[in-house]
From Swiss-Prot:
<dbReference type="GO" id="GO:0090575">
    <property type="term" value="C:RNA polymerase II transcription regulator complex"/>
</dbReference>
<keyword id="KW-0862">Zinc</keyword>
<dbReference type="InterPro" id="IPR050274">
    <property type="entry name" value="Nuclear_hormone_rcpt_NR2"/>
</dbReference>
<dbReference type="GO" id="GO:0000977">
    <property type="term" value="F:RNA polymerase II transcription regulatory region sequence-specific DNA binding"/>
</dbReference>
<dbReference type="GO" id="GO:0007566">
    <property type="term" value="P:embryo implantation"/>
</dbReference>
<dbReference type="GO" id="GO:0010467">
    <property type="term" value="P:gene expression"/>
</dbReference>
<dbReference type="GO" id="GO:0001223">
    <property type="term" value="F:transcription coactivator binding"/>
</dbReference>
<dbReference type="GO" id="GO:0001701">
    <property type="term" value="P:in utero embryonic development"/>
</dbReference>
<dbReference type="GO" id="GO:0045944">
    <property type="term" value="P:positive regulation of transcription by RNA polymerase II"/>
</dbReference>
<dbReference type="Pfam" id="PF11825">
    <property type="entry name" value="Nuc_recep-AF1"/>
</dbReference>
<feature type="binding site">
    <location>
        <position position="332"/>
    </location>
    <ligand>
        <name>all-trans-retinoate</name>
    </ligand>
</feature>
<feature type="compositionally biased region" description="Polar residues">
    <location>
        <begin position="54"/>
        <end position="63"/>
    </location>
</feature>
<dbReference type="GO" id="GO:0045893">
    <property type="term" value="P:positive regulation of DNA-templated transcription"/>
</dbReference>
<keyword id="KW-0238">DNA-binding</keyword>
<dbReference type="GO" id="GO:0005654">
    <property type="term" value="C:nucleoplasm"/>
</dbReference>
<dbReference type="GO" id="GO:0005667">
    <property type="term" value="C:transcription regulator complex"/>
</dbReference>
<keyword id="KW-0805">Transcription regulation</keyword>
Length: 467
């Protein structure tokens, strides 16, 4: 059934208006589909919400599943493996004058020196003993310090690794003041750079490995810059932030007053919340039209998406607006609802969930307006909304928001590699709370105790009639 016929005239007119069409980007970006596990139970709130044993179970549109957003999370700790050879070599065999003790092949790492002239590199036996192989993995083949792993083909410490890398990258040339046979050990490795570098080569460090590493890093950085730039051009976070700022009431219009104490407002906090929601539904349409590419969708699809996500979109807004409020929420009308008022009105449980699962988490991570706008855009572009003419197009727009948000987090908060995932983890709570709020609203509508204005009533009634 065509859901737009259930919208009031104002709603359809606002959605159809072209005066506020958002600027659009061009081109598209394919977001890699990675699927790191975020632990059991994380994805379930965003999957199928299940059957609600309440009157709200008949509301199909607002409670469609969002689909898991985690498929695009690139875990910073993805699977890596390191191949460790079972027969490492020191680079000098038993024929070396430095390893000629019959009692102990390596009596002291300080005795290891490069051979005179360094014209040839002698090899250790092809199959050293197990103890010897284990030992060489834990010491630096150049200076005898603790090895941090295999670098450029040789087990070495961070100091010798860095020295060799700098020498190769800067193409440095050294000279020896003695006879080119200086002792290179942990204490004296910095005394002669020439002999240290020659020993790196003698032990098997490869210059080409440094150059390949540098090229790989350069290619990776160029790809990241290109990817970030492409994502932001397609779904610019600046436009999403502009949409948030355009519809958010100015701070000075807020009135710091409890619901029950404000003589100009009803004593019932539920009534005030419903009235505030009704007013915000008008601005919600204006906000959506400012989100890039939303106005390019078919009009029917725009209506479907707004109907499916209006409750979560409004909850996200007033939750973020309430970050500075203690034990309460701040409505767009400027009214402050304290948790005591909510408990006295019988909605304390859901109110406490808003405070602990949304407001508190947003406050702790200091979620900014751009991040809030991106999360709301993710909610808006819900490809699982019933009745969409082209769900794939909506899903592509959602993935563009994911990409832009991830790029924004990496750029703005480089010291917080897990911030993008932490933001997405607020969506399950938002979905669950949104469903519970719909149950409450539908119950209030049925019993008729709470005045529900026309726009909000239309949102509640239309999906019910369409099912």
């Amino acid at each position: 059934m065509d859901t737009k016929h259930f919208l009031p005239l104002d709603f359809s007119t606002q959605v159809n208006s072209s005066s506020l069409n958002s600027p659009t980007g061009r081109g598209s970006m394919a977001v890699p589909s990675l699927h790191p596990s975020l632990g059991p139970g994380i994805g379930s709130p965003l999957g199928s919400p299940g059957q609600l044993h309440s009157p709200i179970s008949t509301l199909s549109s607002p409670i469609n599943g969002m689909g898991p957003p985690f498929s695009v999370i690139s875990s910073p700790m993805g699977p890596h493996s390191m191949s460790v050879p079972t027969t490492p070599t020191l680079g000098f065999g038993t024929g070396s004058p430095q390893l000629n003790s019959p009692m102990n092949p390596v009596s002291s790492t300080e005795d290891i020196k490069p051979p005179l002239g360094l014209n040839g590199v002698l090899k250790v036996p092809a199959h050293p003993s197990g103890n010897m192989a284990s030992f060489t993995k834990h010491i630096c083949a150049i200076c005898g310090d603790r090895s941090s792993g295999k670098h450029y083909g040789v087990y070495s410490c961070e100091g010798c690794k860095g020295f060799f890398k700098r020498t190769v990258r800067k193409d440095l040339t050294y000279t020896c003041r003695d006879n080119k046979d200086c002792l290179i050990d942990k204490r004296q490795r910095n005394r002669c750079q020439y002999c240290r570098y020659q020993k790196c080569l003698a032990m098997g460090m490869k210059r080409e490995a440094v150059q390949e590493e540098r090229q790989r890093g350069k290619d990776r950085n160029e790809n990241e810059v290109e990817s970030t730039s492409s994502a932001n051009e397609d779904m610019p976070v600046e436009k999403i932030l502009e949409a948030e700022l355009a519809v958010e009431p100015k701070t000075e219009t807020y009135v710091e007053a409890n619901m029950g104490l404000n003589p100009s407002s009803p004593n019932d906090p539920v009534t005030n919340i419903c009235q505030a929601a009704d007013k915000q539904l008008f601005t919600l349409v204006e906000w959506a039209k400012r989100i890039p590419h939303f106005s390019e969708l078919p009009l029917d699809d725009q209506v479907i998406l707004l109907r499916a996500g209006w409750n979560e979109l409004l909850i996200a807004s007033f939750s973020h607006r309430s970050i500075a409020v203690k034990d309460g929420i701040l409505l767009a009308t400027g009214l402050h609802v304290h948790r005591n008022s909510a408990h006295s009105a019988g909605v304390g449980a859901i109110f406490d969930r808003v405070l602990t699962e949304l407001v508190s988490k947003m406050r702790d991570m200091q979620m900014d307006k751009t991040e809030l706008g991106c999360l709301r855009a993710i909610v808006l572009f819900n490809p699982d909304s019933k009745g969409l003419s082209n769900p794939a197009e909506v899903e592509a727009l959602r993935e563009k928001v994911y990409a832009s948000l991830e790029a924004y987090c990496k750029h703005k908060y480089p010291e917080q590699p897990g911030r993008f995932a932490k933001l997405l983890l607020r969506l399950p709570a938002l979905r669950s709370i949104g469903l519970k709020c719909l149950e409450h609203l539908f119950f209030f509508k049925l019993i008729g105790d709470t005045p529900i204005d026309t726009f909000l009533m239309e949102m509640l009634e239309a999906p019910h009639q369409a099912t």
